[in-house]
Design a protein with these regions (language model features):
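Core AdoMet radical
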Residues: 5, 25-33, 48-71, 84-104, ...
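Residue-level detector of alpha-helical secondary structure
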Residues: 39, 75-82, 86, 108-115, ...
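Distinct, well-ordered alpha-helical segments
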Residues: 67-78, 102-115, 138-140, 173-180
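Radical SAM enzyme [4Fe-4S]-AdoMet core and its adjacent flexible, acidic
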Residues: 119-276, 280-286, 293
Length: 300
């Protein structure tokens, strides 16, 4: 499966403060100018030929829309993308959010706006759950869980997708019986996919010192594949760490500027022409999880 999806990042402003934040220390952009720029990108041929669109941050709904001009342009962007999904009968528009906040002020009004257009079934709300460094407390994690369940209650047609980073801590938790993909999905009514950890824009030594147990050991990942992933249905094995289920083009923010990251189904981000300085995967090997899994997938 190949998805010709384009993701746009309007800003990296975020209040959550994950210890492993992949854009830690990066300068942000002017929100109004950025939204105007992304609106102009929707006129390009690549947008007219895309199979779907996504908006990633940063966060959008934790006071980021407090400025009337920013809110107006953000709603215009959402409406323009919705128009394109209807015109071309595209099934999905991805919107990313942490859900670690009170939703009534900014997220729910946007969902009500989309519901009024009878297009809420096109939205895939993308959020994240991690076993370490994301939630500052059990109370924050409980807020996230309650928000997921509340969204299902308010908007049964809304789909929710969760991404979890394959950290050393998470894989050991799973291997020791403290987590189960199917129980988690059933309890919260979500689909879960998994991401390879990376250092973002931080040097690996400083990163490992700040967030130990985040980057995985290679032996832990290989054991996780043998003992966990090998038990999954065939489609889930195919989707695991498969770049082709993700966006192919991302307009990302680096050093305070937008950069187009293209052909992601073929060229990993770390090998893109912009200066990403990213370490993927392991704390003890130069290989990546994706490379290792390609070799293992057909044998499990």
């Amino acid at each position: 499966m190949t998805n010709n999806i384009i993701q746009y990042c309007p800003w990296i402003d975020c209040n959550v403060g994950c210890d492993f934040c992949f854009v830690h220390g990066q300068p942000d952009v002017d929100k109004v100018k950025s939204l105007q720029y992304i609106l102009s990108l929707l006129k390009l041929p690549e947008a007219r030929e895309a199979d779907g669109f996504g908006l990633i941050g940063g966060e959008f709904f934790q006071n980021q829309l407090s400025s009337p001009s920013v809110k107006e342009l953000f709603y215009e962007l959402v409406d323009r993308i919705l128009d394109m999904t209807v015109e071309r009968n595209l099934p999905t528009f991805w919107i990313a959010t942490s859900l670690i906040f009170k939703m009534d002020k900014e997220l729910l009004p946007l969902l009500e706006h989309i519901q009024e257009r009878q297009l809420l079934d096109r939205i895939l709300l993308c959020t994240s759950w991690d076993s370490i460094y994301r939630f500052k407390s059990r109370r924050a994690e409980k807020l996230w869980e309650c928000n997921v369940l509340r969204l299902h209650e308010l908007y049964p047609e809304l789909r929710i997708h969760v991404e979890t980073v394959l950290t050393e801590h998470f894989m050991n938790l799973y291997l020791e019986g403290g987590y189960d993909k199917w129980e988690f999905e059933d309890r919260l009514g979500v689909r879960v996919d998994y991401l390879e950890p990376n250092t973002g824009f931080q040097g690996i030594k400083n990163f490992v010192d700040r967030v130990p147990n985040f980057l995985a050991k290679r032996a832990t990942f290989l054991r996780f594949v043998r003992e966990v992933v090998s038990t999954w249905p065939a489609q889930d094995k195919m989707d695991f760490l498969n770049p082709r289920i993700r966006s192919n083009v991302v307009y990302n923010i680096e050093d305070g500027e937008h950069h187009r990251i293209g052909d992601r189904h073929i060229i990993p981000i770390a090998q893109q022409p912009t200066n990403h300085r990213i370490k993927y995967g392991y704390s003890d090997s130069d290989r990546t999880m994706e490379d290792d899994y390609k070799l293992l997938r057909d044998s499990i």
